[in-house]
Swiss-Prot record:
Protein name as annotated: Potassium/proton antiporter CemA
Membrane topology according to the record: Multi-pass membrane protein
Family to which the UniProt record says this protein belongs: Belongs to the CemA family.
UniProtKB keywords: Antiport, Chloroplast, Hydrogen ion transport, Ion transport, Membrane, Plastid, Plastid inner membrane, Potassium, Potassium transport, Transmembrane, Transmembrane helix, Transport
Subcellular location(s) of the protein: Plastid, Chloroplast inner membrane
Lineage: Eukaryota, Viridiplantae, Streptophyta, Embryophyta, Tracheophyta
GO cellular component, one term: chloroplast inner membrane
UniProt GO BP: potassium ion transport
Function: Contributes to K(+)/H(+) antiport activity by supporting proton efflux to control proton extrusion and homeostasis in chloroplasts in a light-dependent manner to modulate photosynthesis. Prevents excessive induction of non-photochemical quenching (NPQ) under continuous-light conditions. Indirectly promotes efficient inorganic carbon uptake into chloroplasts.
Keyword Chloroplast: yes
Keyword Transmembrane: yes
Signal peptide: none
Any coiled-coil regions, as ranges: none
Length: 229
């Protein structure tokens, strides 16, 4: 029985890692045609208005330079003028199609994120026994490590997450999450999160070190401060 309980967290941990990814991928593949059809038929009018007001005008900044050539075009034959307008029309359709696909992918990503969150929540509430065993494994593993290795690991993780070279990594990660949930890219909001989130983590870490590690392992705190200096 103990051996059986010891082996239980292995498939549990593997399912936590792979099952949400597999279900979200299957969901995306099966739902994409339906979402595409729904968006193209039911949301096309609203979407085109949004494109005209926000996105396409920005993409047409480069095309505005072409309209400065009107004086030259007036000297062209009628067939050349028609070709010019046909080219502009094709470019407009291409931009609308590209933005349409982006919005469809945003809907799919948002849906799969909700599914993954629901699956992980189910694991948390339904797998209490496995979580207890897994937690005991982690605590036993950390307990068997020396204080030097623990201090080195804490220092490595903190330098990676809140070190002086970490803002670029936080910017990429927050920007990716921001885009994955369908929000428009905003440099000011991302910069604000990058400048505040590591500070919050640093404060939490210092609180954890001084109020928890000082009671559990004072020698670890001494080694950590010695390595940090």
């Amino acid at each position: 029985m103990p051996k059986k309980k010891a082996l239980t967290p292995f498939p549990y941990l593997a399912s936590i890692v792979f099952l949400p990814w597999w279900i979200s991928l299957s969901f995306t593949k099966s739902l994409e045609p339906w979402v595409t059809n729904w968006w193209n038929t039911g949301q096309s009018k609203t979407f085109l208005n949004d494109i005209q007001e926000k996105n396409v005008l920005e993409r047409f900044i480069e095309l505005e330079q072409l309209f400065l050539l009107d004086e030259m075009i007036k000297e062209y034959p009628e067939t050349q003028i028609q070709k010019f307008h046909i080219g502009i029309h094709k470019e407009t359709l291409q931009l609308v199609k590209m933005h349409n696909e982006d919005h469809i992918h945003i809907v799919l990503h948002f849906s799969t994120n909700i599914i993954c969150f629901a699956i992980l929540s189910g694991y948390y509430f339904l797998g209490n026994e496995e979580l207890v065993i897994l937690n005991s494994w982690v605590q036993e593993f950390l307990y068997n490590l020396s204080d030097t290795i623990k201090a080195f690991s804490i220092l490595l993780v903190t330098d990676l997450c809140i070190g002086f070279h970490s803002p670029r990594g936080w910017e990429l990660m927050i920007g990716s999450v921001y885009k994955d949930f369908g929000f428009a890219h905003n440099d000011q909001i991302i910069s604000g999160l990058v400048s505040t989130f590591p500070v919050i983590l640093d404060t939490i870490l210092k609180y954890w070190i001084f109020h928890y590690l000082n009671r559990v392992s004072p020698s670890l705190v001494v080694i950590y401060h010695s390595m940090n200096e």
